[in-house]
């Protein structure tokens, strides 16, 4: 049961095709669904394909709380450097390709796991000085970009042949905000021969997986309601508290709710459910020698949940 007022309140796991920008996908979904409030989670390059979750209606208020970790499959091509760090860019350097065994590759890739700093590419949506980096790049201007902390949990070789040493297929699990193009570039710099990203598929974004994605064609066929994922399902990683029915009016007014004794952390996000249905999300606060949950995002719900 959908506790929210509109039948299209929640998340859709869209399969973005190559050749469309993330903005194009959102614009097309908006036209198909006739829903003004739509937002996507995590920009995908135009040439990339894969999971692009979008939020509809009230769910757009919850985007910041959705898990941001990602999984990718990518093609790494050695011996070239381009101005965009991928195959679509202008070649600026070419170098001989080194011969490496699979074992040597596995040892090398261990250096690129864990916490590290990454400088985003010039052709990216990162803002510097109030402008997107790709806007500077279009004008032929290169600006200094601050590095960002990222985490690569796993990087595995899916395919490598020693008779074709210039290409690898990699699987990467990483934190949100990681640029796989830049990872490929940095691997090439480490080897001294340069490298770029070929194709890229996002296989997972938070709880959204490639095998459960839906196409824009399916949206055109009217299948959105059955593909919709509820906010409660998407926020399963957050701890939960059940609201007593007599406290529902107070919740609607945004009043704090008493939390059972637990080792809460100040500011910790909590799902606020009634009969298993998400009605709000709040944060733990310590007040008057007890823990309370202060609602921060109260959703508009249908009175049918009381029946």
From Swiss-Prot:
Q: Which reaction does it catalyse?
A: uridine(55) in tRNA = pseudouridine(55) in tRNA
Endpoints of the signal sequence: none
Q: InterPro entries in the record, alphabetically?
A: PsdUridine_synth_cat_dom_sf (IPR020103), PsdUridine_synth_N (IPR002501), tRNA_psdUridine_synth_TruB (IPR014780), TruB_C (IPR032819)
BP term (GO), one: tRNA modification
Listed GO MF terms: RNA binding; tRNA pseudouridine(55) synthase activity
Pfam name, any one: TruB_C_2
Keyword annotations of the record: Isomerase, tRNA processing
Q: Where is the active site?
A: 45
Which EC class is the enzyme in? isomerase
Classify the source by domain of life.
Bacteria
| EC number of this enzyme | 5.4.99.25
- HAMAP family registered for this protein in UniProt: TruB_bact
The protein's matches in PANTHER family, at most eight in alphabetical order, are given as:
PSEUDOURIDYLATE SYNTHASE TRUB1 (PTHR13767:SF2), TRNA-PSEUDOURIDINE SYNTHASE (PTHR13767)
Describe the function of this protein. Responsible for synthesis of pseudouridine from uracil-55 in the psi GC loop of transfer RNAs.
Q: Would you identify the family this protein belongs to, as annotated?
A: Belongs to the pseudouridine synthase TruB family. Type 1 subfamily.
Q: What is this protein called?
A: tRNA pseudouridine synthase B
Q: Which organism is it from?
A: Heliobacterium mobile (Heliobacillus mobilis)
What lineage does the source organism belong to?
Bacteria, Bacillati, Bacillota, Clostridia, Eubacteriales
